[in-house]
């Protein structure tokens, strides 16, 4: 119990939960520093970067892929995250593919999925990335990933087309591409329930009250099990 109480991460999380002022610090396991001191070294050091908004997520994913020497298109070895539950897609171990699962893109190839022309839609095909998704618990094979989500951060299929295709699933199969994004930086919302050794948190100010902000920040810092850098 004493060791837990002495943890810098726990001390910081308690201060946040109690809405006490957070001071800059340079501890052994926790560093709280101004956001303008962010560096490429910090981004590459972290096991996981956490942000508050999708805009920041898209920005830092692009920056980190550039730092790693990756090009515009998705590449083998890219870190990606699943954005929805796909209960019918099972890994080799029999585990369903669920929202928030982080893993590695394997063997990506550009592809195309066609759907019936009687569907009311601007086009009658989806551009996809056919790939395997490798996770700690197993590999999901031959997934058709939404290419637009990875390249632009936008869905290729709007809700009207998705609704029509969903009603025809038993007849034509599941043709809607699966929604994945790069996972180098993710939102705190997607990080709930997960934990990493080294975490970098980019604090953001939101238009909600102090209590709600404290809850968000508490969730963010407690994702770190060993070392934490909080930029604010």
Regions found by a protein language model. Give the residues of each.
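Conserved coupling/interface region of RecA-like P-loop/ASCE motor cores
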Residues: 1-37
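Core RecA-like ATPase module of SF1/SF2 helicases and allied nucleic-acid translocases
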Residues: 4, 48-232
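Alpha-helix boundary recognition
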Residues: 14, 43-44, 221
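Short, solvent-exposed polar/charged micro-motifs at secondary-structure junctions
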Residues: 6-11, 36-42, 91-92, 115-116
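Interdomain hinge/linker elements that couple catalytic modules in large macromolecular machines
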Residues: 21, 29-44, 49-58
